[in-house]
Amino acid sequence: MNVIDVIYERMGNHEPSVIVTVLSGARQGDKVVYSETGDILYGTAIEGFTMPERIQPQLFSIAQMECFLQPVEKAPEILILGAGHVSRCVADQFLFIGCGVTVVDDRKEYLKPEFFDSRVQRIHLDFKELQERLSLDSYTGIVVVTRAHEFDSVCLHQVRHVLPTYVGVMGSHKRIHHAFKVLRQEGWTDMEVNQLYGPIGLDIGAQTPEEIALSIVSEYVAVERHRKGQFLSAKRYQDEV
């Protein structure tokens, strides 16, 4: 197996890996693939190298060699439930940040190829069959943007078991308040309801479908990175105090 084979095999198994490339020095051009725990998966060990506690892209020098460390993970997979106009914009935004995207709707006419980028997987399916037909725990984020509250409710019951995976629900504050009240009446715990993101998105004053999509994807990124989505300028002022 070559380095590409090793990486693809790891990605296919949802196993992260780390590539260390020697940029200069005696082993210039060499690539070594490690597991997150430092086990060698491909190549010859770099003497003295140990896996850093925080794994992120970085340059480092060791044994008179300059090296570059690059973590490799399978692209996040997003499931979008509902195929309306906002859904199309949301799909495009998630593709833009490197996610895989699957869109599900029970209306076949809303899943035409011309409505979505060719990289989007389109599935015609009754929302009541989500749990039976899809591996829901393989998604890192689920976005519920159906056409009516009753379909939102069906979707939420279908994905309930994957919490605390990111699950966002689009709707007005009034619609979301009512929907979450009904969920509690149907047996959802406060902890489960509080793990849902609704109304979905960061408050950036979004109005158009494109802006709403930006708001939704921004919230997803903030949640995944354990951030609150505040202004960076505000953070600067806090640091100066």
Set out the residue ranges of the language-model regions.
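Conserved SAM-binding strand-loop segment of SAM-dependent methyltransferases
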Residues: 120-126
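A short acidic, amphipathic alpha-helical/loop segment
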Residues: 93, 154-158
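Short beta-strand segments
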Residues: 21-23, 81, 105, 145-146, ...
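Short amphipathic alpha-helix with an adjacent loop that forms part of the alpha/beta core around
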Residues: 128-138
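Adenosine-phosphate binding glycine-rich loop
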Residues: 170-241
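Segments forming oxygen-rich coordination pockets for charged ligands
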Residues: 1-106, 110, 114-119, 137-140, ...
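ADP-ribose/adenylate-binding Rossmann-like module
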Residues: 104, 141, 146, 157-182
